[in-house]
């Protein structure tokens, strides 16, 4: 549709820059961004990724962002990513003042009032974004600017949305020397590559004090599961596309 969209994964709080393959948490995809990418690409939008874990520092980020020259950037934000996400947003507006900035993810949903105070943010998407984010992109592509900054996500039918766009990460990683023939870094040695993680549902039947309140904010209290046929179809796709040997 002519609109260039760059998604940003700011996950450098743990292992820092140049950290691809430096442990399991530096070799997994963000299913949130991968799902948003799949939904946006299904509607014809040009989507690419900047994964801060693959870069060498903020100057490198500036260079890559200037090369991509996006019309829209989308930043996912967990609370641990708060500082690098803020910095990425500030640099994005510095590099291209006209870029439309969108943030979403767990921190935005759970700490909305705090997120509203983050500078350089045009729109905030709470909850699940597979319906809301492409809708925003369609409006922007038509020259419209939604009047409200906060856009409430709508829970999608999990069998109706596209499978996670793992190539969003894999193609980006390979630009920076990722040479493992696997969509993701295996969790343990007993899970041989090619390896991938799969999300079979949203919400949780348990009541752990650490993550359950956040799950409820993001996905609601009801557990939603994909059908067995839908999960098997994704597994078959992963075997055909990546010769999948193990998954979790």
Question: Language-model features: where?
Answer:
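Glycine-rich beta-alpha loop elements in corrinoid/cobalamin-binding modules
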Residues: 32, 36-165
């Amino acid at each position: 549709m002519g609109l260039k969209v760059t998604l940003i994964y700011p996950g450098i709080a743990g292992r820092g820059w140049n950290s691809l393959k430096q442990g399991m948490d530096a070799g997994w995809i963000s299913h949130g961004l991968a799902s948003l990418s799949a939904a946006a690409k299904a509607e014809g939008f040009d989507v690419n990724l900047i994964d801060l874990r693959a870069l060498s520092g903020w100057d490198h980020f500036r260079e890559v962002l200037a090369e991509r020259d996006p019309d829209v950037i989308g930043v996912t934000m967990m609370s641990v990513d708060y500082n690098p996400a803020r910095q990425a947003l500030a640099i994005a507006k510095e590099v291209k003042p006209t870029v439309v900035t969108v943030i979403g993810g767990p921190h935005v949903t759970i700490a909305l009032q705090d997120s509203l105070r983050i500078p350089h943010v045009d729109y905030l998407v709470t909850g699940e974004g597979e319906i809301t984010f492409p809708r925003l992109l369609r409006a922007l592509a038509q020259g419209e600017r939604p009047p409200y900054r906060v856009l409430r996500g709508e829970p999608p039918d999990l069998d109706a949305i596209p499978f996670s766009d793992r190539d969003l990460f894999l193609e980006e990683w390979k630009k920076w020397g990722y040479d493992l023939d696997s969509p993701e870094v295996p969790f343990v040695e007993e899970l041989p590559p090619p390896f991938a993680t799969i999300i079979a549902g949203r919400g949780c039947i348990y009541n752990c004090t650490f993550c359950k309140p956040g799950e409820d904010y993001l996905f609601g209290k009801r557990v939603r599961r994909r059908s067995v046929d839908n999960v098997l179809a994704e597994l078959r796709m992963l075997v055909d596309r990546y010769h999948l040997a193990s998954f979790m």
